[in-house]
A protein has these predicted regions:
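Short pre-active-site segment immediately N-terminal to redox-active cysteine/selenocysteine motifs
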Residues: 30-33, 37-41, 84
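Structural microenvironment flanking redox-active thiols in thiol-disulfide oxidoreductases
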Residues: 68-78
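Conserved helix-turn-beta segment immediately C-terminal to the redox Cys motif
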Residues: 30-31, 49-68
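Structural signal for short hydrophobic segments within the conserved structured cores
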Residues: 4, 64-66, 98-101
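Conserved redox-active cysteine motifs that mediate thiol-disulfide chemistry
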Residues: 37-51
Length: 119
């Protein structure tokens, strides 16, 4: 599976309805997810893009992997307080999402997947 470019509308449908957001996180997905917040002009984002694609392929059917262009989806970036990119949001089936800020290599990301998504 390739990564899917996510819009605000898709986020509301597949992850969480922003209008109904409260103190409690209510994930709509049917499997854990990773959201890569990036920008097309960001060097570190370009560096991890192939790694994120590899994760999407390696974990196909187990984890949904999305990409959010922060310049096109400012509302989503603001909602999660994204100020540094790349930022990866790891969304488990239960519990709150966990963020990873900055470019990380595959072993580090796989550890986060095991620790937070595929327990």
């Amino acid at each position: 599976m390739k990564t899917t470019e996510m819009t605000t509308a898709m986020f509301k449908d597949r992850v969480m309805d922003l209008e109904k957001m409260s103190d409690k996180w209510e994930f709509k997905g049917d499997k854990p997810a990773i959201i890569d917040f990036y920008a097309t002009w960001c060097g570190p984002c370009k560096m991890i893009a192939p790694i994120v694609e590899e994760i999407a392929n390696d974990y196909d059917g187990k984890i949904d992997v999305y990409k959010v262009d922060v310049d096109k989806n400012e509302e989503l970036a603001a909602m999660f307080g994204i100020q540094t990119i790349p930022t990866l949001l790891f969304i488990p089936m239960e519990g709150k999402p966990v963020t990873s800020v900055g470019a990380k290599m595959m072993p580090e990301l796989e550890e986060m997947i095991k620790q937070h998504l595929l327990k």
